[in-house]
Amino acid sequence: MRLRKCVPRRRSVSWTRFVPGRSRSQGAHQKDKTAARTAPTGLSGLRVVDFSSMFMGPYCSMMLAQWGADVIKVEPPHGDVVRYLGDERNTGMGPIFLNANRGKRSISLDLKRSESSEVLRPLLGKADVVIHNFRPAVEASLRLRGTDVLAHNPQVVCCAFRGFGTSGPYAGRPAYDDIIQAASGMASVQGNGGPPEYVRTVAADKIVGIMGLAAILGALVERASTGSGQLVEVPMFETMASFMLMEQQGGWIFDPPEGADGYVRTASPHRHPYPTKDGYLSVMIYTDAHWRAFFEMVGRTELIDDPRYCSMRERTRNIDELYALVAAELVGRTTGQWQADMEARDIPSMPVNSITDLFRDPHLEAVDFFERVNDRTHGAMRYARAPVIVGKAPSELRPTPSIGQHSLEIARELGLSQRRIGHLTQVGAIGSQATEGLV
């Protein structure tokens, strides 16, 4: 599938608002739902073509959609495999997919068929951003390498999520969240001296997705100055190694090392939510003022000037003793009693929420964190809104699309005739839910 070079006529969108010093001010979250429907959002006018699947790329493009970008999800005829994970009301619309792909449009293309290039060429030509997580051999076979895409559209930002950087010996290896948690040291740290353990969420996928978002926005800032696009590679392994080493490198920042790796406080076996009389409480007694207030609160004022605990350096050296002391104190009273006393003394603390507790959290309720919608296909639903609002008001997002829900709409926008769309649908190059009136 060859792509002819296409230098698109740029839409009248000024991306100088991303240049430092020229940014629009970020508005507060607006409760006025009418304003939310009509006000422009930070990325309005940005077109994103997203070939990625699973978690990492879709999480990145979901955030772009939440900030107002027009995200077009390109799916194979069978759809993204994540569609089929978890409980569902309708086939192919599982909860993870619903969350990660809200606000996007879906076009179904069989990229292995040469005819699909009739849609792919203009789609890439009108894109501001292209996202994919193809392995190098696959992107080469589909002619979707960064060089291919940039040759076709020199102004596009092409974000390629990789398992491993392409210049190293691991290039081209398959990678998933578990693999990268293991390779990056995250699983080892979770094991805390025992058998390694995975973090019980797709941490690497989501962290790398956020790094991809930052890389895309940085490339758009540069494009605002130069007018040129670029290939941005976001490797999972290198990203997570950097993420872990920030505080875990320890004495190994020196060459030769001046001590052990790791961060003593986070490695303490006593660092965990503390049992109370009726549950658990997370407490972060950190500064000199925090510890003084805590010792006074529990009647241990003799420890305030104890040389083992009078400075952050010494407390870190004796952190196991301190955490054990806190644990022994907290077990005697209820979570609510402790939290009230700690809040009065400005000591950071929070009860331990389950996932379902979040839906009843009074703070999240007060900030309208959950958007409740009545979807005509799925019925009543609730979504977590964007935690950060860019622009004057949050956008009202499209519902999560079914496979190829917008194929015909997008093909028409790209200038294909009704007859040609009908032919491409008949031969299987385009997949769509609607075929009426195409031939």
Predicted regions and their residues:
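Mid-domain beta-loop-alpha active-site segment that forms a flexible
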Residues: 202-217, 236-244, 286, 290
